[in-house]
């Protein structure tokens, strides 16, 4: 029996919606990264993007355990010399509610062109509304 290798044009992708209200950031991010990569499917192939589309709603209500809301640091650079800036999880959630989950998932995906294509299938929204109802996303419980 020959080993099955998925081809990009043969992959079928589903749409899933995840309600992140009250869920822990890392647990949601690891499951989302797994599904974006396609590891939950029997036809998973490492060099082909076999993952599904994921819509995350209520990203503003995601939580972290312990004192991570003050202790977890996010860094960015302004591209000027000495321009490193840092912020914590709490301030990041106030200013950009979906960015923390997006950065967490992006860090769990492979780096390179394949990983960049995978992260484009993640849609994050701070509130309960999303514009992807036409795709009829299935609810996913974590």
From Swiss-Prot:
InterPro entries: Ribosomal_uL13, Ribosomal_uL13_bac-type, Ribosomal_uL13_sf. GO terms for cellular component: cytosolic large ribosomal subunit. This is Large ribosomal subunit protein uL13. GO terms for biological process: negative regulation of translation; translation. Belongs to the universal ribosomal protein uL13 family. The keyword rRNA-binding does not apply. The keyword Repressor does not apply. Keywords: Ribonucleoprotein, Ribosomal protein. Pfam families: Ribosomal_L13. GO terms for molecular function: mRNA binding; structural constituent of ribosome. It comes from Bordetella avium (strain 197N). PANTHER family: LARGE RIBOSOMAL SUBUNIT PROTEIN UL13M (PTHR11545:SF2), RIBOSOMAL PROTEIN L13 (PTHR11545). Part of the 50S ribosomal subunit. This protein is one of the early assembly proteins of the 50S ribosomal subunit, although it is not seen to bind rRNA by itself. It is important during the early stages of 50S assembly.
């Amino acid at each position: 029996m020959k080993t099955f290798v998925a081809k990009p044009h043969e992959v079928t992708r589903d749409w899933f919606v995840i309600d992140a209200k009250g869920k822990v950031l890392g647990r949601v991010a690891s499951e989302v990264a797994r599904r974006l990569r396609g590891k939950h499917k029997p036809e998973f192939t490492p060099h082909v993007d076999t993952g599904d589309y994921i819509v995350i709603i209520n990203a503003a209500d995601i939580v972290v355990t312990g004192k991570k809301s003050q202790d977890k640091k996010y860094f960015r650079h302004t591209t000027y010399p000495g321009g490193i800036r840092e912020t914590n999880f709490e301030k990041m959630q106030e200013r950009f509610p979906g960015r923390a989950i997006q950065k967490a998932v992006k860090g769990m995906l492979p780096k390179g062109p394949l990983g960049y294509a995978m992260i484009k299938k993640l849609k994050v929204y701070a509130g309960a509304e999303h514009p992807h109802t036409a795709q009829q996303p299935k609810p996913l419980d974590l």
